[in-house]
Structure formats: structure tokens, C-alpha cells
Amino acid sequence: MCSSDLGRGACQQVVLTGAEAALSALPVLKCWPADGGRFVTLPMVNTVDPETGVRNVGMYRMQVFDDRTTGMHWHVHKTGARHYDAYKRLGRRMPVSVALGGDPVYTYAATAPMPDNMDEYLLAGFLSRRPVKLVKCVTNDIYVPADCDFVIEGYVDPAEEKAVEGPFGDHTGFYSLEDRYPLFHVTALTRRRDAVYPATVVGIPPQEDAWIARATERIFLSPIRMALQPEVRDLTMPEVGTAHNVAVVSIDRRYEGQAVKVAQSLWGAGQMMFNKYLLVVPSGTDVRDSDALARLLRRIDPVRDLVRSEGILDVLDHATATPGFGGKIAIDATTAGAALNPASQSESVPQLSLPEGCRTDLLEKWGAALAFAEPGAGVRTPEGVRYFVLFDPAAAELMPEELLWLAAANTDPRRDVRTEGATLVIDARSKRPGEGGNPARFPNVVTASEATVGLVDRRWTEYGLGAFVESPSRRYRRLLLSGGAQW
């Protein structure tokens, strides 16, 4: 699915080295007001394992520090970071080449949850049904697609001190805060004569990256069935879960504990290890039908049907006290549909004694009452509701899907999810940094500045965007805890 060419590719029609290889020639974006600078947001970062020679192509954001230097945002769980550690052990400088653009299938492949030691360009060739033609870079021995738009060649020196990178308005809808990451040094910049610079902006869902997650659902469902869990029938990662926080899987249930088996297997498989909340439903359930899911969730027993665990989470998860590690919950709803006789089950809302200011618009469908109180303030748990969810007062007017995004993002199941009688209590409020097992830092949500919103509003017709749409940033701005990237 790959072929190498000893000649030049279209991506090398223009070759700049030395002082001419300046990153200021690229229209790199600063996406959000509290970002630490400008970031390359769709890079295909090519590295090679120094011991096996196997290539990895990953997507790791790159903060531009100057014309010749960027950060390299390698999370500890990623293959690029493992390659970095291998070069460090060997005491060798690490060649890196960053491809931009070309066939969009390359960009997708760089994000795909491929098994370690498998070349992402094999997936790209398989999906496009033609080999990916690769050419050797000018200043290092890495091969990149011949038809991409730009290539930034360079190296990372593992002996060099890491640099402070961030903040960055991330796909979670929150800022990922400053941390230390390796430096990438540019040795050459090559491009097509007609090159188009690709970029994306991520933030509160749904954004463009939601479609990448949707493609991953469909492409990797069959491999999950064949290699991991043959009982899996369907899988979805809702947009509100920002790829990792929420997933729904339907299975053919034949025996007791099968949902637990599936949950534990998925939590140990590739990027599914980052999942935080997993709903397991019986086969025949449409995993994208909120009405069908709500019927099951109203009927679960929060004591019997909850599977609690802990394990690896995304480094970008801001709710955990230990970065990259926290609680997980699976809900076994595979028998919930048969738990009660539908003919005798009343779906009416019971008379409840709710705390003042509760929202009840989700009570009939989801069995959920919502309360709004300052972080840390005590709130009485009412009897007779299946779910009782606590939010900051600023979230009181959010839509249901926005509340689900916020609840999944702001909670560590070990600390924030408990049962009181037959009620599942979820504390989705902001966490005061450093208090009571809370994270040491807590980020702000990502919103556009009023200056940017006003500019877009004034030029809407000029942009040709169709019917006017009010910026959601104006509503989300109520959620801000401070004026910067963090509380």
C-alpha cells in the first residue's frame, strides 16, 4: 500500500533551507483568545522507531515559538513519545518530518487508532484503494507522501531541555494548560508551487473533528468485532463526548456479566483506553436514538448495573487529580428493557420534593433532575429521581446536549459519581483547584472574544455563510471562571 520514489515529489517543487526555511511564511492560526501562541493544528508528524525502523504518523499540535522552532505536543501515551524515549535512551538526535495537506485520507490516517508498529500510510492506501507514493525528505531520511502541500523537515534533540507549551483551546471544549514538551527544530521547508495550507479549529462540540470521530466509529467497528469482541453489534462516540468521554456500544448478550467483559476489554484496547463513561445496551437498540437510550437509562438500577473501574484517561482530561489517570464507569443496560413490564410501567413524572431552582425538563425523558449551585455547596438529594446532576449556576440555560458535554468533561467518576439510595448523584460542577482531591489546576471553557464575534457578525453576508447564526460563544461565556485559560 506504499511505494517509495528516489526522485522528487510535488511537495518538493519549492525547497527552502537555512534562514529561508521560515515558519512565518505559513499562515499559522492563533485559534482562541487565551492560546499561548499560534499552532499548527493539522500536522502529520512522521517519525521512525530507531530500533525497528517502523514509521509512525501521528497528529500532535505544534506551537510556533519562532521561525525555526516549535513545540511537539507528544502525550506520554502516544507512539511519537515512545519513539522520543527510544532516541533518548540511545543518545541520538531524532529526525522528524511534518507533512501538511495532500490527500485528506493522510490526515485522517494520522488520527486513526492504529495498533502500535503499524504504518498509518498502509491504512491510507487501503482506504483510498491505491498505494501512497512516498518521497525522501531533503535534510533527513524520512519518507513523506509525494503529493502533500507542505513538508516541514527537522529534528528533536532528546538531550535538550523541554520547553513550556500552551495553553491551547482544545477539542475537549476547554483549554489544555501549559506543560513542558520537546522542541522541534526546522531544517527545511518544502512545498508545492500551488500549496494550500490546511488548518482546523477545535473547541466546544460539535466542531470539524466530530466527523473524524464518526469515520473512526465506522472504519474500526469490524476490527473490534473480529479481533476483540465478536458480540459487539454497533458502537458510537457521541459528539458531546469529544471522542473519549462517552461511548455507547450494543452487544449480543448471552450470559451474565457479558457487559462487564466487553467494557473491560474495550478499556484495554487502543485509544478506547481513554473512555470514561460507557453505556452497554442490548443488540437491536439504535445506539444513536436518544429516545431508545433514555428508556433504558430510566430503568437501570444504579447500584446493580454500574461497573466501576479506574485506569488511563486522556492527558487532556482536566477533571482528574492525577493527570492521565482516573475513574471509569460502565452502565450495564443490557437487561434494563426487560426489567419492567412496559404495559405496567408509568412514564409520568412523579410528584417530587425538589430543591429550589431545579430544572425538570429532562425528568420525563431521562429521569434526571438538575440542580445549580456554587462549587462545594451542599445540595439535598431528592428521593424518587433516577439521576440527580449538579452544575454551576452559569450552566442553568444550557441545552441538554451541552449539559451532557459539561457533565462528562467535568467529572472524575471516582470522586464525582455516587449512589444515594436508588439515585445516581453526579457532581458536574467546576472543581476548585487543589481542594478535596480536586485537580491542581482547572481550565476555562473555550470561547471567542467579543471582538472576533462582532467582526464575524458584521461581515457575515460578505463571507457567504447563508442564514445568520448567533455565535454560541456569547452563551458559553457565562461559564468562564476567570479572564484567562484557567481558574
Model features per residue range: what roles?
Residues M1-P33, D103-W487:
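Charged, compositionally biased interaction regions
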Residues Q13-A99:
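Internal mixed beta-strand/loop scaffold within catalytic domains of large alpha/beta enzymes
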